[in-house]
Amino acid sequence: RMPLFFKWTVACAIVLLVIGVGYNFYQSHNEANLVYREVCAVRGEKLLVLLPDGSRVWLNADSKLTYPEQFAKYNRNVTLEGEAYFEIAENKKSPFQVLAENVKIQVTGTCFNVKAYASDKVIKTTLDEGSINIGHVQSRRPMQQMLPGQTAVYEKRSNVIKIKTDRYHDDASSWKSNRLIFRNASLKEVLTTLSRHFDIEITVKNEKIASFTYDFVCKGNDLNYVLEVMQSITPVSFKKISEYTYTVE
């Protein structure tokens, strides 16, 4: 179990040897035997990953990043499961590409957040600086360009990507500074975030409260305070069963 006070740590990676075709990256024949690093941030943990090209990636809780030990000459490809904030070193001759399920994001140098948890219904990409192109992994259609302050939402069920200007785009990376921000978030969304953030399990004992929504901002280092805030907003009651287990009704 990880402590509830998060400290950024430079990640130690597990080195994986990936041989053959069919891997998530689009590899040419001379890339087939690349050695890959897999970095995992468990629930209740955040990591800072330093990439071979000098780029930096902040990995949120319950997330995994896979990347080559050394990038290929003309591309820099990584895969993401979960959430991460990317600060990419500029190199126009070697584009940087993030693959997150059925979404691909291409950049040459910029800062952006990607939220791509497998259990979520959507994948969200929010751009802070520079510009990026976003599209479907296996689509031949032209990729869509994003500008700072925009968020792209990929709906998994419809397989559609929609880009919009987001007045709250700074919220996307608030987790880096250990802040929890919820805007019209359902109870399920809030509990899912808390479970990842604090490495706990919360069981809903009364389905009637599932329709409750929440709007609040707070520091992410005190679970009890967060639960008190939720209880002040809606008529819910949290009960601690064990150190890492709670119920709500």
Regions found by a protein language model. Give the residues of each.
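A residue-level detector for the "anchor" residue at the start of short, highly conserved motifs
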Residues: 3-249
